[in-house]
Amino acid sequence: MFRAVSVGWKKYWWGTGVLPDRTNRVEDIYLRFYNGSTCEEYVDMPLDQAHRLFDIKGFEKNNPTVLYMHGFIETAQQESIQVMVSAYLESRPDTNVILIDWSNMAHGSYLVNAARNTKKVGAATAEQVHKLIDAGLPLDKLHLIGHSLGSHVAGYLARELKNKYRKTVKRVTALDPAFPAFYPDGVVMEHIVDKDAEFVDVIHTDAGGYGAPVRTGSADFWPNGGKSVQPGCPRFAPVPLSDDNLCSHWRSWRFYAESVRNPEAFPASPADSYHKFRENPSPEVGMVYMGANCDPSARGSYYLTTNAAPPFGKGMEGIYYKKKNKKATNGKNNMK
């Protein structure tokens, strides 16, 4: 096992080179527009042919548009993408859902290849999104969502639109943005920040592990404290990038997808720390919803608790932290 762990981390950082079927070129980034009611109905096109979207049946340019950016070593068939896309197609069918498939540049070495490619992918995508906006796509209805490395792709995309094309995105959602190589800021790459869009909301579920260790948005949400191990995830999962090892990191997109279907599933309470949240006698004061329907005026850190399995949302119960009072319990037992 320990040899597997060692080999796993070496592959994570240094990789095995670009995979044979991966070109590592921005010219081979694809857009996948889901034009049906399931994840199996879609149209793929090269990024530089984004203008074709306007001619595809099912694409309504005046409707809300979500651009989703996946994470490290993911492909278009990954569970995270299927879960996120299905939530929108089934619950919000009036939304244009588009995957930025940069899997050709998200493989190989994390440090040498994938992390450094986030800026290239963001810039290349921004150029095409800029053209779509000039052709009539409403900027105020554009929502960028990214998971892990995809969060930083979304940040670079929004930053490029703002700085180069003078177009400010209304909202970027970062789902447990990747930690290694991005924090502290500039250690290798620059990370997503609150100034990248009018509103940047962040969901932390593996802070200090695979995910960002600090606040990085306009509003940062810390379910169950925001760290590993999230409820329902294995406590011992030493093999890097295994499903068990990624469980807490993946909770971010599972929570968000659930919020698309149930916008009031995850009330969150403002607090300076998880400890203060647990001690707060009035957590409903300043409460906002984490996820799809988050109030864009929210600022600061917010906390909540979740269930260990779907449905993860507890509703209002999630902001009332229940303490185990062993003394009280023992006292009652002694009185019997």
Task: Describe the predicted segments one by one.
Residues 145-157:
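Glycine-rich nucleophile elbow surrounding the catalytic serine of serine-hydrolase chemistry
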Residues 170-181, 204-207, 226:
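Active-site nucleophile loop of the alpha/beta-hydrolase fold
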Residues 136-148, 172:
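Alpha/beta-hydrolase fold nucleophile elbow
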Residues 69-71, 147, 176:
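The conserved beta1-alpha1 loop
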Residues 83, 156-160:
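Active-site signature of alpha/beta-hydrolase-fold catalytic machinery across serine-
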Residues 1-99, 105-117, 126-139, 164-167, ...:
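Flexible, membrane-associating and regulatory peripheral segments of lipid-active enzymes
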